[in-house]
Curated annotation (Swiss-Prot):
GO MF, one annotated term: phosphoric diester hydrolase activity
Function noted in UniProt: Dermonecrotic toxins cleave the phosphodiester linkage between the phosphate and headgroup of certain phospholipids (sphingolipid and lysolipid substrates), forming an alcohol (often choline) and a cyclic phosphate. This toxin acts on sphingomyelin (SM) with high activity. It may also act on ceramide phosphoethanolamine (CPE), lysophosphatidylcholine (LPC) and lysophosphatidylethanolamine (LPE), but not on lysophosphatidylserine (LPS), and lysophosphatidylglycerol (LPG). It acts by transphosphatidylation, releasing exclusively cyclic phosphate products as second products.
Cofactor comment: Binds 1 Mg(2+) ion per subunit.
GO biological process, alphabetically ordered: killing of cells of another organism; lipid catabolic process
UniProt-listed InterPro entries: PLC-like_Pdiesterase_TIM-brl (IPR017946)
Alphabetic keyword roster: Cytolysis, Dermonecrotic toxin, Disulfide bond, Hemolysis, Hemorrhagic toxin, Hemostasis impairing toxin, Lipid degradation, Lipid metabolism, Lyase, Magnesium, Metal-binding, Secreted, Signal, Toxin, Zymogen
Organism: Loxosceles intermedia
Signal peptide: 1-18
A Gene Ontology cellular-component term: extracellular region
SUPFAM superfamilies according to UniProt: PLC-like phosphodiesterases
UniProt name for this protein: Dermonecrotic toxin LiSicTox-alphaIVA1
Keyword Zinc: no
Catalytic activity: an N-(acyl)-sphingosylphosphocholine = an N-(acyl)-sphingosyl-1,3-cyclic phosphate + choline; an N-(acyl)-sphingosylphosphoethanolamine = an N-(acyl)-sphingosyl-1,3-cyclic phosphate + ethanolamine; a 1-acyl-sn-glycero-3-phosphocholine = a 1-acyl-sn-glycero-2,3-cyclic phosphate + choline; a 1-acyl-sn-glycero-3-phosphoethanolamine = a 1-acyl-sn-glycero-2,3-cyclic phosphate + ethanolamine
Amino acid sequence: MLFPTALIFGCWALVIEGADNRRPIWNMGHMVNEVYQIDEFVDLGANSIETDITFDDDAMAEYSYHGVPCDCRRWCHKWEYVNVFLDGLRRATTPGDSKYRPELTLVVFDLKTGDLSSSTAYKGGKLFAQKLLDRYWNGGNNGGRAYIIISIPDIDHYAFITGFREALKNANHEELLDKVGYDFSGNDDLSSTRTALNKAGVKDREHVWQSDGITNCILRGLDRVREAVRNRDSSNGYINKVYYWTIEKYVSVRDALDAGVDGIMTNEPDVIVNVLNEGNYRGRFRLANYDDNPWVTFK
């Protein structure tokens, strides 16, 4: 009877695995701006990273760099040339490459558009799309597989998204937009954010992530997070996913999960992993993997 018993238990395991109704969580490593940090943060449990992108006077993406001020207990000056970083990121997210990290499924580009005007934002979006096409997506031929979020701090720079989308369409690679999502990170009111997305050509719930947060040096409540979660879960909302930044205290992580977020941006991904393994959370949440589409609202 050993074989039938083992078979039964195996079948039950498959049923349980297939019926996993826990919310997938994106553990988002913050301020990953040098190539070596990709492995560093993934080793700590991150399945997503955030990278800062700065622009030159011609609206061309130049460095992966944050600068001062930045989070407490972090070094603000790590950097790479954008092309170097994108090459490293492509390798880390391309199956078969010796540097491939299958855990890494989502990348947030925090676009430092502060020195761009509303008009040059459009140009910046076009140029950044072309750079991703060339350096990350390898011209559309077996490039990196991670999902990408274009995150912009200023809703007045919505034309960056317009330019980005148009550039991929004009390059006959509109299919790559299936891998691209959008976020405005300036903590504006949600109705204004929705309007900016619509002006950019992004429909409601079209790969929309809504961030809320502040540097880890300052405490911030969860009122706007809860408002975003209500929008996400409503029948007439515009949001697919909600994430909170930047936290690493255990109590803050628990509070964010209890509020219903889909992602947490952090300097200490191992803290998020530890909380997800706690008794009160491991039955409700799990780390997202590549089979979890970040554009699909969890029900």
